[in-house]
A protein has these predicted regions:
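Extreme N-terminal starter segment of soluble prokaryotic enzymes
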Residues: 1-4
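Glycine- and acidic-residue-enriched helix-capping/strand-helix junction motifs
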Residues: 13-28
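Short beta->alpha junction loops
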Residues: 44-52
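Short acidic active-site motifs
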Residues: 53-57
Length: 124
């Protein structure tokens, strides 16, 4: 099984940015844990602060990955283009968030939900 972990804007700063909300664990630490727990799963990662690059990565996932784990960062709340890209591909996509977006501002709640298969909230 091959999974693409796709991270959006500012997630390159995970572990250093707004630690009270997002925690102090760097993405590399999460990845090390995931690889230890799921040694038989091929995990590839891609992070971009650019919306179009995330859309391109979603499009390229078809036929290459069995699924995508996607944290769109702030684009979760604003990007219809990313929502449409997820809806346009056959690859299953699971939306994840480090913080509990449902406990935060209303505008953070819904835009990606309609097209993802599942949602995982608050990893901190």
């Amino acid at each position: 099984m091959k999974i693409l972990i796709l991270n959006g804007p500012n997630l390159n700063l995970q572990g250093r940015r707004d630690v009270a909300v997002y925690g102090s664990t760097a993405f590399e630490e999460y990845l090390t844990r995931l690889r230890a727990v799921f040694p038989d799963v091929g995990l590839d990662c891609f992070q971009s602060n650019v919306e179009g690059e995330l859309i391109d990565a979603l499009h390229r996932s078809e036929g290459r990955y069995d699924g995508v784990v996607f944290n769109a960062g702030g684009y979760t709340h604003t990007s219809v283009a990313l929502r449409d890209a997820v809806a346009a591909i056959a690859t299953p996509v699971v939306e994840v968030h480090i913080s509990s977006i449902l406990a935060r501002e209303e505008f953070r709640h819904e835009i990606g939900r309609a097209s993802c298969r599942e949602r995982v909230l608050r990893l901190v």
